[in-house]
Regions:
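Long acidic/polar interaction regions in large eukaryotic complex-forming proteins
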Residues: 1-11, 93-102
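Secondary-structure edge/capping motif, primarily at the C-terminal ends of alpha-helices
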Residues: 17, 42-50, 77, 81
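Low-complexity, charged, repeat-rich alpha-helical/coil interaction segments
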Residues: 2, 30, 34, 40-41, ...
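Non-transmembrane, amphipathic alpha-helical segments
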Residues: 16-30, 48-65, 69
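Amphipathic alpha-helical binding modules
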Residues: 60-102
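N-terminal acidic leader/helix
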Residues: 5-42
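Generic serine detector
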Residues: 11, 47-49, 86
């Protein structure tokens, strides 16, 4: 599965969200991690029959599409909020923004 963001980048966004209470980008990052886990599970799951194999391939394909969509969503929200995507540093304006608990 193609990955636009590596685990360290996603974790950095999540870590900053915990400190500064900017939960929305972190929620998207968590969803991306969960989709990656689901995809890996489906790819590695043992199949006892042709039907089982088809089920796992169907889930993996849908997960791959959802993952691509969520990575594009993350890119867009980081652009909108003004995150530095070379360092994944949260913009100063968001650090002062009161947020909702994660």
């Amino acid at each position: 599965m193609k990955e636009q963001f590596n685990p360290a980048q996603l974790s950095k966004v999540i870590d900053q969200a915990l400190v500064y209470q900017c939960a929305c980008p972190a929620q998207v990052c968590r969803a991306i991690f969960e989709l990656r886990e689901l995809y890996e599970y489906q790819i590695n799951c043992a199949s006892d029959s042709v039907n089982d194999e088809l089920v796992h391939k169907t889930i993996a394909a849908a997960t791959e599409k959802a993952h691509e969509e969520m990575e594009e969503c993350l890119k867009k929200i980081l652009d909108i909020d003004g995150w530095d995507q070379s360092t994944f540093a949260m913009p100063e304006g968001l650090k002062k923004k009161p947020g909702k608990p994660l």
